[in-house]
Each structure stands twice: as C-alpha cells, then as structure tokens.
Swiss-Prot record:
Descriptive protein name: Enolase
Sequence positions that bind (2R)-2-phosphoglycerate: 165, 337, 366-367, 388
Note on how the cofactor is bound: Binds a second Mg(2+) ion via substrate during catalysis.
Main location: cytoplasm
GO biological-process terms attached to the record: glycolytic process
Gene name of this polypeptide: eno
Subcellular location: Cytoplasm; Secreted; Cell surface
Length: 421
C-alpha cells in the first residue's frame, strides 16, 4: 500500500448551492482508485481568509467563474503532485503551499489547493478501504458532534430584515446523534407551523433555515422557544440557543448599527449580557467585529466563563490568528472552515492548536455548499465536538447530517455523542 502513488488529477468547474461556480477535483491513483472532492464558498467572508481565486470576468458567470483555478490545478498543480505517495498527506499539502508561495494562497487560490488536498485524502482512505474519518483521525475518531442547527436565517444569508445571520437550536440533551436529529426535526416542523400561524413567510435562506421578516430579534427567540416547548422539550435540559451575529457586517465608524440600535462596543456587550440572561443562549459567534480587538477582550472577560464565544472572522482557521487570540484572551471557541485556509493539514493544525489550549472547536460549512460530506468526517476525525452545517432543509445541508448518521451506525457502540457544550 505504501507505494501507491497519485497518477492523475483532473479539475472541473461545477455549481454550488447558490448557482455559483466552484471546483471539483478528481484524483486517480496508480491502482486506479478514484475519489472526488468539491469546495464550498462563503457569502460572509472574513478579511483575513485565504484567497478564493475567481475569474473576475463580468461577462462570464458575473465574474464568479473559476476556470483560472481549474486550469491551475490541471496545468500547474497536477504535474508537481503526480507521482507522490498518496499516504503522505502532510508532504502533499506542504507541496501545495509551496507551489502557491504566498501567505494567503493569493496566487493559485485556496479553492484550488483545498479541492486537491481533500480529493487526495479521500482517495487514500478509499484505497485503504477504511472510512475517511478513520484514515485522518485514527482509532480515537469516535465523537459525534453536537449540531448547531440554523433554523432562522438573516443577515447576508437571507433576503429579509433580520441583521443577525443565524439563529440556531442546539440539541444538547440528546443521548446520541440520531436522537439529536430527530428532536431537531420535530422542532423544525413545529417552527414552520408557528410561523405560518403568525402569517410569516416560510421560504428558506441560503442555509435552509426559514427567512421570515420578523420585526425583532427578541421575537425570533420567543418563537423558537415556543416551537421547542410545543414539541415537548425543555430549554437547557433538551435544547439551548445559539447565534451567529456576524457583527462585522454592521460595524462602521466604530459603531454597531442594527435594527433600531446604534451601539458602541461597551453598549453592545451589555446588550449581549441582557439577551443571554433573558434567553437560553449558550453560544455567540462573531458577536464583535474582527478588527475590534478591545471588544473581543471585553466580551470574553464579561461572558467567556458563562457561554461559548466563537471566533470565525476573528480566526479564519489560521494558526497565527488563533495563537494571537489565545495569548490575548480573545474568545473561547474557534470555528473551523477548511476553505478559509486551503489544505487538510492546515485545517487540522488549527483544530489541534485550539484544542490544546482548551478552546472549543466547531467544524463548519459555508453558505455556498455542495453535496461533498468531507466536513462530517473531519468533525469525527478531530473529535471537534460541534458542527454547523445549516438547517433541516436543502439537500446539500442534509447530506452532511446524513453522513454523520451513517458514521454513528458504523461506529456502533464505540460512538460517543458530544452533547452539552
């Protein structure tokens, strides 16, 4: 097995869940094993993310084409990767990093490197005839993540008046992942009924959650809690709530402007203290803009010992930024998005650094997704403990949940559900 090499790499342009072009890479090994990987794309993008290479030709897919990236894979990356040992993932990923030669993948694109990196890992697992989570995580890969399920979409993920990007339910009281899915689906059904009864629109946003024009954030909380309780569940015991605020999207001139509010940092932190004491909110993602370092210090100091404070735009799956956060006591959890950094190895380095320093880790999808289920395997492989992959509608979201259901059955009695955060 150790002498099985990469024989061919083929990239092509496909479409993601929003109809935007993205990359699919196919790897063929010397023993004719084949594997494919597709990469996602974000709508709310952190300033410090690795660069996603687009064509920027306004006459072709409105500038969103990825033919440049596809050509780079086929003509530049492939010749330097072909012939390498399939099982040496770290060496392959380091070669991809070297080919790019920049700090942020700006030359060949993180979408190019990630597609190749993931396809090779999947091919390696396939040729060894073991699941991907076991190949990259070993015998300790057995923790099924608690899902943070986005039931109401707002912000840049929906065409409505809600400023906060995601309102999530967290089934922390389930005994296994299968139960978490059942409980959450029941709440999702009930939520739809309640929204209809209040004459709110039940169309869905990019990530599959409902996207109604609800007037206030507090009303959203009340409606979700009502759906949970009318489904026969109790707050905290069975479910808690989470928010992805995406505060950078409404931060300007050192002020946070959303709904009818205009807050400075101190006032915004007080607002969060109020809503987290009033409602069972146990996770806040990007509650502060990425460049507001003092704000991150303040909210971590004020709420970090009570709830989960998640950095997404703050860290962008980058070890240097995570290390800076650790040293300066910014946040207590890291959102992990492989396409923010560009290779499987760098993704795992970010996870390990966070976990080593007692930061929670949450593997995450993007708003523009495909049917690729690699993040489900990464969640289990790295024992991340939590996953964000959208709501309980749209098949590109359900594909990840269904893969986790399959993994739980495969692990059988070895499977452990992470549960409470």
């Amino acid at each position: 097995m150790s002498n099985i090499t990469i024989n061919k790499i083929l990239a092509r342009q496909i479409l993601d869940s929003r109809g935007y072009p993205t990359i699919e890479a196919e790897v063929i090994l010397s023993n004719n094993t084949k594997a494919k990987a597709c990469v996602p794309s974000g709508a709310s993008v952190g300033k410090f993310e690795a660069v996603e290479l687009r064509d920027n030709d306004k006459n072709y897919y409105n500038g969103y084409g990825v033919t440049k990236a596809v050509n780079i894979i086929n003509s530049e990356i492939a010749p330097q990767i072909i012939g390498m040992n399939t099982l040496n993932q770290e060496k392959i990923d380091n070669t991809l990093i070297k080919i790019d030669g920049t700090d942020n993948k700006s030359r060949i694109g993180a979408n190019s490197t990630l597609a190749v990196s993931l396809a090779i890992a999947k091919a390696a697992a396939s040729t060894l005839n073991i699941p991907l989570y076991q190949y990259i995580g070993g015998i300790n890969a057995k923790v099924l993540p608690t899902p943070l399920i986005n039931v109401i979409n707002g912000g840049m993920h929906a065409d409505n008046n809600l400023d906060f990007q995601e309102f999530m339910i967290i089934p922390n009281g389930a005994n296994k992942f299968e139960d978490a899915m059942r409980m959450s689906a029941e709440v999702f059904f009930k939520l739809k009924q309640i929204l209809k009864s209040k004459q709110y629109n039940t169309s869905v946003g990019d990530e599959g959650g409902f996207a109604p024009n609800i007037k206030t954030n507090n009303e959203v909380f009340e409606i979700i809690i009502d759906a949970i309780e009318k489904s026969g569940y109790k707050m905290y015991k069975d479910f808690s709530l989470g928010l992805d605020v995406a505060a950078s999207t409404f931060y300007k001139d050192q002020k946070y402007k959303f709904a009818d509010y205009e807050f400075n940092t101190q006032e915004l932190v007080e607002y969060y203290k109020n809503i987290t004491s009033q409602y069972p909110i146990i996770s806040l993602e990007d509650p502060i803009a990425e460049e507001d370092t003092n704000g991150w210090k303040l909210i971590t100091q004020e709420l970090g010992n009570k709830i989960q404070i998640v950095g997404d735009d703050l860290f962008v799956t980058n070890c240097k930024l995570i290390q800076n956060g650790i040293q300066n006591n910014l946040a207590n959890a890291v959102l992990i998005k492989p396409n923010q950094i560009g290779t499987l190895t760098e993704t795992f380095n970010a996870i390990r650094l966070a976990q080593k320093n007692n930061y929670n880790t949450i593997i995450s999808h993007r708003s523009g997704e495909t049917e690729d289920t690699t993040i489900s395997h990464i969640a289990v492989a790295a024992n991340c403990g939590q996953i964000k992959t959208g709501s309980l509608s749209r098949s590109e979201r359900l594909a990840k949940y269904n893969e986790l259901l399959y993994i739980e059955k495969q692990l059988d009695i070895s499977a452990i559900y992470y549960g409470a955060l």
